Amino acid sequence: MSLTVEVDVMGTIVTLSLFHADGVDADRAKPYFDEAEHVLREVDRVFSTYRPESPVSRLRRGEMALGEAPPEVAEVLDLCREAREMTAGWFDPWAMPGGVDPTGLVKGWAAGRALSVLAAAGTDGALVNAAGDLASGGVVAPGQAFRAGIADPASPGTLAAIVELDGALATSGTYERGSHLLNPHTRVRESAVASASVTGPDPALADAFATALCVGGEAVFERLIDLDGYEALLIGFDGSQRLSPGFALVEASV
């Protein structure tokens, strides 16, 4: 049995879920849901580029030094540097117009922080779904792992694949918005594939890798398959799929 709370934050709906074989007590779960929501709202307050007075917006405009910003900003930018190096620059927040923009990693990072709060509730499992960025811990029920669907970018409302989830899943793609990702090497908004999904232990890095794969395609895929714990699924504009050897695909073309 499960209990789910929806939070309208970061320009999307984030779902917070707890799972337990004997059921989830709503009163006992409430403090964990409340704290997880607080974490998400604080991330939005600090990192939103749509809030003119957020620390990240002020940092981008040169009105605030990094040392004056909340410490989590430096933490996230360190992760961004790590992801930039691991993707050979295909993920590069410093290439964004208007100054450094860690948006391509923050949602996954926020999901991971919220999951850490929910995991302390002591249930069989916990799940955070931040509109394409999933962070999971534990199981749905004893012996039953989490599963997640990957949307078909060419057919809204249908699934291209189902994956067994142990940790994080991040998906980036064209979907309804078309090509919205900036190629950091050409500074042009373009995508190499229709969709890129990444599983792995760190929701923030999975988020960054999915973004990099979407714009870099095969060039990033070849680097990613050498990273311990991370797997990928690419869906081409023609519907073709390419999986890394360890991608936990349950079902394709659903």
Feature locations, PLM:
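Mature catalytic core of soluble alpha/beta enzymes
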Residues: 1-254
